[in-house]
């Protein structure tokens, strides 16, 4: 898995400004070759009490700049199966839902904030409507764990 991940993933050191900007150049090269890319736009992942963190601009700016559509994906079970408090996670399948494609080809940079907000709202709505409620259960578990510590 590690070898494949390293070959396919665009690695970024979020604490290093150079590394963050280098990602754009690398992603542009991948896109120019006709490959699709998958970007997780959440600002932060470590606060388990938040259902869906705000999105960063990079993925959306890249879509507008390269005139590419966005296919939002909802990963229902990540908070429960891969939490930051590792002793409470467990292996298994992840449920994923592809939302309708968003045509970013017609958008301009001034549409960026609106695009980010609309995409965030759509993903969050689907998470809240999940019949299994795994993300919400993970938040409840985290609150119980952190309050008893």
Outline where the language-model segments fall.
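Non-catalytic C-terminal accessory region of glycerolipid acyltransferases
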Residues: 23-149
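Catalytic core of membrane glycerolipid acyltransferases/transacylases, capturing the structured
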Residues: 1-18
């Amino acid at each position: 898995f590690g070898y494949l991940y390293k070959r396919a993933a665009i690695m970024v050191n979020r604490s290093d400004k150079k590394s963050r900007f280098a990602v754009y150049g690398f992603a542009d090269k991948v896109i120019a070759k006709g490959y699709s890319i998958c970007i997780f736009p959440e600002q932060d992942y470590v606060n388990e009490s938040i259902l869906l963190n705000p999105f960063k601009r990079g993925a959306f700016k890249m879509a507008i700049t390269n005139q590419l559509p966005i296919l939002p994906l909802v990963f229902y079970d990540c908070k429960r199966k891969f939490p930051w408090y590792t002793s409470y996670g467990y292996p298994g399948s992840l449920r994923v839902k592809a939302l309708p494609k968003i045509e970013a080809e017609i958008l301009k940079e001034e549409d960026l904030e609106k695009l980010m907000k609309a995409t965030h709202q759509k993903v969050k709505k689907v998470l809240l409507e999940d019949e299994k409620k795994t993300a919400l259960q993970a938040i409840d578990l985290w609150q119980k764990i952190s309050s008893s510590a």
